[in-house]
């Protein structure tokens, strides 16, 4: 069994307010995506990394691969219009076999703890898949500027990445989505649509996705604390 990590890195990063996509901006001396990739480079359970990116950033990623000795990166493929398209392009380019695991992780989640990654891989090896989530702690409402109803937070999770699936299951789910003109916000939605049960694994509050300027400031503070 081989474990292949797919990192879709084609987001525009418009909500962060940055001029360039946030994953290519330097924070604490390294591009954001390097912080993310090093988590996978350093984890012994990960065998290979495939990146999907906009064509005009592929050269930069090749440079970063060499500069930071990211030796597990086997391919850098062109991404698509949607995140789903980028993941699918990377998945099709892989040489994964039926018993191999495919990890999908957001490029803009650089603070993924090693124990969360390792635990999710182990769960996927045992149960066939793993979806990293954190339990909701806040009171949750449904509505549009006016409260319509309250959700039971004991039954609600915030979905994160990594999301891990057996290669043939994820490929089947992707093909099904395209056959039905469906675009999902993550891979677990696609896998559930083909009848698979998805296993929840505990995530971390530090594994947040950097989307806004406030997230960038939070990342800097947490990363600096880790270096102390």
Describe the residue ranges of each PLM region.
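Conserved N-terminal catalytic core of the sugar/cofactor nucleotidyltransferase
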Residues: 34-99, 178-180
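Short, conserved active-site loop motifs that form the nucleotide-linked donor/cofactor pocket
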Residues: 3, 73-75, 156
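N-terminal glycine-rich phosphate-binding loop and ensuing alpha1 helix
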Residues: 1-58
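Short, flexible, basic/aromatic active-site loop/helix in glycosyltransferases
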Residues: 141-165
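Conserved beta-loop-beta/alpha segment of the NTase-like Rossmann-fold superfamily
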Residues: 75, 81-143, 160
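Short aromatic/basic micro-patch
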Residues: 26, 111, 150, 164, ...
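Conserved alpha/beta core of the MobA/IspD/sugar-nucleotide pyrophosphorylase nucleotidyltransferase superfamily
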Residues: 158-228
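Residue-level signal for inorganic ion chemistry
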Residues: 7, 33, 90, 105-106, ...
